[in-house]
Regions:
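Intracellular juxtamembrane helix-capping segments at the cytosolic ends
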Residues: 19, 100-113
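C-terminal membrane-cytosol helix-exit motif in multi-pass small-molecule transporters
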Residues: 140-144, 159-178
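Glycine-rich segments within core transmembrane alpha-helices of 12-TM secondary carriers
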Residues: 120-139
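Helix-to-loop junctions at the C-terminal end of transmembrane segments
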Residues: 47-60, 144, 242-255
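Transmembrane alpha-helix termini and helix-breaking/packing motifs in multi-pass membrane transporters
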Residues: 25-26, 49-57, 134-154, 214-215, ...
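Helix-loop junctions at membrane interfaces in 12-TM secondary transporters
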Residues: 79-90
Length: 263
């Protein structure tokens, strides 16, 4: 789980940090193009429910590592497709790897940890992921000019690192048997309607910002790779620093009040 927690942000953080500069500087995207790209990218997320049918034939751990490998390969070859149809196709493939992996990975985490140890263990996994993202951003900022990195070399390094970790996980670690058998069917509860609604609103808000904020910084304000990645790094550091305060706020005022303030 630690390996998978590190591998995903290594590939995805580099992909997302470089994407806007790549599509503007190399492919000459406009606002419509970037909207189409992210629309294509969200299709596998919507279809991630199909993972349930795949699990009838493939173990969750095997599927998770396979999707992680797919994400790594797609990230590695992103710069090989500097045209609209190519970048849309490779984005679709990387999105399949990302969303299907995320779906299965969350399931594995909850299966392999007991209720007592889950909060602590999940927190540690998130910390490993944040550390990997931090390293990826710093590497881009410091190495873009000093190491004469290009879009292709950066994507290749990040993608192949992710792919290598997936292969290592597949070869070295055996298939762990979950203590609780996984239910291979969709479960929807009427009493969870508010959770479903909040997830929908959160996703919509996040996508609107993710799609256009970074793109605008590059297209309208001319930010280069290092400047935009520095913004991402500052945001990450602030999130890490404020996480403790937010945790205390939730503990003091309750989840409902905290969510009400957020939304």
């Amino acid at each position: 789980l630690i390996l998978m927690a590190v591998a995903l942000p290594l590939a995805f953080s580099v992909w997302s940090a470089l994407l806007n500069n790549f599509v503007v500087e190399v492919i000459r995207f406009d606002g419509l193009d970037i909207g189409v790209l992210h629309t294509i990218r969200e299709i596998p997320g919507f279809l991630a429910v199909g993972v349930i049918s795949i699990l009838l034939f493939v173990r969750e751990q095997t599927l998770a590592l396979s999707m992680l490998a797919l994400l790594g390969i797609a990230t590695a070859v992103t710069a090989w497709f500097p045209f609209l149809s190519g970048i849309l196709t490779i984005t679709l493939l990387s999105s399949v790897g990302f969303h299907f992996f995320e779906t299965v990975n969350q399931s594995l985490q909850l299966q392999w940890f007991s209720k007592e140890e889950a909060p602590n263990k999940l927190g540690k996994l998130m910390a490993y992921g944040s550390a990997a993202t931090l390293i990826a951003y710093i590497f881009i900022i410091l190495g873009w000019e000093k190491l004469n990195l290009s879009f292709n070399s950066a994507y290749m390094l990040a993608g192949l690192s992710c792919f290598a970790i997936a292969v290592i996980g597949y070869i070295i670690f055996p298939n762990f048997k979950a203590a609780v058998p996984q239910t291979k069917k969709m479960v929807i509860r009427k009493r969870y309607w508010l959770y479903y609604l909040l997830q929908f609103l959160s996703g919509a808000r996040r996508q609107i910002f993710v799609v256009f904020a970074g793109f605008m910084m590059v297209e309208r304000f001319g930010m280069d790779v290092q400047q935009l990645t520095t913004l991402y790094l500052i945001n990450l550091i602030l999130n890490i620093a404020l996480a403790v305060l937010l945790e205390r706020a939730v503990a003091r005022f309750g989840e409902r009040n905290a969510l009400a303030v957020e939304y």
